[in-house]
Amino acid sequence: MANTTSAKKATRKIARRTAVNKSRRTQMRGSVRLVEAAILKGDRAAAVEAMKQAEPQLMRAAQRSIIHKNTASRKVSRLVAQIAKLAQ
């Protein structure tokens, strides 16, 4: 339990940031799931459209330290590779 005023304020700030980060992480995961679902269906057009939404969200999450930059890049790379396989 926080004793000082500044520690109490820090606790409130952390709670707010956690809520925001959880929301952003949930949105990011949802957009990635849409891409993965389109890939599983074999619908390349839908996968490309979903990827246009997912990539900026992944990179924004990395920029805001919700996920690591390399993790975001790896996810984007793997999804793009899977979409490219659909074209063959």
From Swiss-Prot:
Record's keyword terms, sorted: Ribonucleoprotein, Ribosomal protein, RNA-binding, rRNA-binding
GO molecular function: small ribosomal subunit rRNA binding; structural constituent of ribosome
Superkingdom to which the source organism belongs: Bacteria
One GO CC term, this protein: cytosol
GO annotation, biological process: translation
Coiled coil: none
Family under the similarity heading: Belongs to the bacterial ribosomal protein bS20 family.
NCBIfam families xref list: S20
HAMAP family membership: Ribosomal_bS20
Main function: Binds directly to 16S ribosomal RNA.
Descriptive protein name: Small ribosomal subunit protein bS20
